[in-house]
Amino acid sequence: EANRDFSMLTSDERVKHIITQADYYGYSGDKVKGLIFCSSIKETEELSAKFNQITNPAIGKLYRTIALNGRASEQERQDAFERLAMNEDEANEEKQPLDYIFSVEILNEGVDIVEVNQVIMLRPTQSPIVFIQQLGRGLRKANGKEYVVILDFIGNYTNNFMIPIALSGDRTYNKDNIRRYIMEGGRVIPGASTVH
């Protein structure tokens, strides 16, 4: 379905679905510290506002999220990154931890928030570079984080044969290996990772 209607991503039903799946697949650590990649500024703002009105089932409190885009100042970005990395016991009246940052136009590269334990992709891309950059936001090791959960609601990994190749870990670029990997559907990624 190349012509999916991405405007439906902000519907209440879709928001509930995203939250249900994010809760089901979970995260490593004491609390979620997630990045959500969106298609537009409007989408980040609407989704953040809707999440902030919903109770996080893991902790019984409203989600705390923020929408960030290219118009945010460097100070606003740094503040958001610090809040995302915070634990509950570090909260104070001035700063509360964030559960998610909704992002468009930024965070693909050059950002290092090692505590990120969940990445949600709501943005379509045909670019294996952008896909791997977004995926990579959660791949850094951190104390208390054993793994990262990547939820690709768009199915970017199926849209471009270069993405499964990038995920395969095979750097030989042997045509027979690539053909076999693509024909198998890349269901199992090397290591302890799977695609569902």
Outline where the language-model segments fall.
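SF2 helicase motor core recognition
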Residues: 101-116, 136-140
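Conserved interdomain linker/interface between the two RecA-like ATPase lobes of SF2 helicase motors
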Residues: 1-38
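Short glycine-/polar-rich loops that comprise or flank the Walker A/P-loop
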Residues: 60-64, 114-118, 126, 143-150
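Conserved segment of the helicase C-terminal RecA-like domain
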Residues: 128-133, 137-171
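Conserved helicase ATPase core of P-loop NTP-dependent helicases/translocases
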Residues: 35, 45-46, 59-108
